[in-house]
Amino acid sequence: MNLLITGAWNDAKDHFDEFEKLGHHIEFLQFEKEALPCPYEWVEGVICNGLFLFHAIEKFANLKYIQLTSAGFDRVPMEYVQEHQIEIHNAKGVYSIPMAEFALFGVLELYKRGKVFLQNQTKYCWEKQRDLLELYGKKVCIVGCGSVGTECAKRFLVFGCEVIGVDLFPREDEHYSSMSGLDMLEDILLECDVVVLTLPLTEETNHLMNESRFARMKRGAILVNIARGAIVDTEALIQVLPNLGGVVLDVFEEEPLSAENVLWNMGNAIVTPHNSFVGDGNGKRLSKVILENLYCG
């Protein structure tokens, strides 16, 4: 297969010899915005992240295989892929561990008032905090019970939480005390102390967390979004945030987040630059997924 590999796979060059022994022919594109090093018609398979944001997929007349380095499919014109029966794989499970750790970190940061302690340290201020919360015994709702959501569930269970799942395709799973469909989300929000969003962005999930659903959240509850920014209606969130215990946002409707956005300066908001997926084990896991899919193909 004629493979175009982009710099989205950091360890790609370590495997070129292996690919060639399997009969694949390789062209490499470091930056996906740049011109291709080969004709579009030459390409039969791609390993990429956002290649089709910069190069129309219709130009790849002989494309039959796509391997993404991302967990989501939202940067690919999936209707075209399905119509042309192109085989496609994502990086399922690659980023689940660091993202789950990040979600847990964010909740603990808010419960244990990490911001306050850090600010006091910079001022050499010895001041006890009397309103720290325990994670033990809290009810956590994971919205999106795929690999990322389930890794989150495992970690919250270890801390003694009750974990409830909400998913597009509810099922029985040992990591959740129950799992319901999205149609039950509004009722479930009433009883949960922590809500973690890990589901994909689709037409159905766009602005899933809107004004009416925020109104259903418990006073003092925490929202974590490590999924996609557009799942949350940002303006509605800003309005309700004073009533919440806090919010952990790693993704936003517009990235980078504008310097003028009030979220930067809200005391109970943790704002991070789409960073939750980063971990020192990603490279090994991603290479394993890519190689397994190619071997099976």
Regions found by a protein language model. Give the residues of each.
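A short helix->loop->beta-strand "cap" motif at the edges of active sites that frequently abuts
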Residues: 60-64, 83-87, 161, 219-221, ...
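NAD(P)-binding Rossmann-fold cofactor-contacting core
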Residues: 158-175
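Rossmann-like adenosine-cofactor binding region
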Residues: 170-262
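Glycine-rich adenosine-cofactor-binding loop
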Residues: 7-9, 92, 133-157
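Phosphate-binding beta-alpha-beta segment of Rossmann-like dinucleotide-binding domains, i.e.
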Residues: 86, 91-139
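Residues at the starts of beta-strands that form the adenosine-phosphate
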Residues: 2, 25, 139, 161-162
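An N-terminal-biased, well-structured beta-alpha scaffold segment characteristic
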Residues: 1-87
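C-terminal helix-to-coil terminal segments
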Residues: 89-102, 116-117, 255-297
